[in-house]
Amino acid sequence: MKNILVTGSVGQIGSELTLELRKRYGSSNVVAGINRTLPTGDLADTGPYLKVDTTNIEELAFAVRKYRIDTIYHLAAVLSAIGEKNPGLAWNIGVNGLYNVLEVARENNCAVFFPSSIGAFGPTTPLDDTPQDTIQRPTSMYGVTKVTGEMLCDYYYMRFGVDTRGVRYPGIISNVTLPGGGTTDYAVEIYYEAVKNGKFTCPLAKGTFLDMMYMPDAIDAAINLMEADPSDLKHRNAFNISAMSFDPEIIAAEIRKHIPGFVMDYDVDPVKQKIADTWPNRMDDTAAREEWGWDPKYNLESMTADMLKVISEKHNKGLI
């Protein structure tokens, strides 16, 4: 049985990934690594947790040794828009934190999952059907940390044999955890505002197409990649994965199929728009499909129906 540590376990992806890992591998075998925010609810009640500041290598090594960790899902990160406001913090957590994770993994024979992002691409990257292997050169600090992370993971595999694996996530949409400063967060906020107020002001411009994915598929991607036969993996790290691509008008139109009176206007955030304009419209995820069987379950229609159902239930119960 695996012994797993999840860093960034109270974040958008980490909180749901930790619970799913506990279901699959046993609650006591999955440790939630926390830093400034204490876990609540099921995350706190279903398994162990302890403070793990990934920028503190001694603290990280202690957690790995204490729980005899053999697999680290490294989710601790600073999101894109926040990273532009505090680039030093983004670098420290995004790069120095990952370096510590890889060093501890090397010393303790751990496998490492590292999530990269569509943010790893830049304005010179082909925006349509973005290839698996292509020029990147991002212009945001978030993107710089992700490209650096991809290269570090490749280096530690080639140089030291550390079993590093990772994906490039698109925007992630969740009905559980509220967003926290990402460029694609509007695609979560729009559902909540549609249910609560019947209207939404979008911070990205009409025609801004971005790759997106529903959280259940994002979680499956991480776990399935880590379970894949290593002999099948030609790339190992930074796999493009995609589930759907849309702009604000398309998602609004889908919501109107369920809430006919929904209205949307625009107040474009220049920081988020500048970042979004450099990201792919849609990535080519052929490598992930061929090498480890990537196959998302949700498209825009099925995701929208599920999002609105769950959020409406929360709203009716007074939870949001």
Regions found by a protein language model. Give the residues of each.
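C-terminal substrate-binding subdomain of Rossmann-fold SDR/epimerase-dehydratase oxidoreductases
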Residues: P203-A205, D211-I320
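N-terminal Rossmann NAD(P)H-binding glycine-rich loop of SDR-like oxidoreductase domains
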Residues: N3-R24
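Glycine/proline-rich active-site loop of Rossmann-fold NAD(P)-dependent oxidoreductases
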Residues: V147, F160, I173-V188, M215-P216, ...
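Flexible, glycine-rich beta-alpha linker
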Residues: G122, R137-M141, R165-D185
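NAD(P)H-binding glycine-rich loop region in Rossmannoid oxidoreductase-like domains
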Residues: T54-I93
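Conserved Rossmann-fold NAD(P)-dependent oxidoreductase catalytic core, especially the SDR/UDP-sugar
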Residues: H74, Y99-M141
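Conserved beta-loop-beta element that borders a ligand/cofactor-binding pocket
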Residues: S117, M151-V176
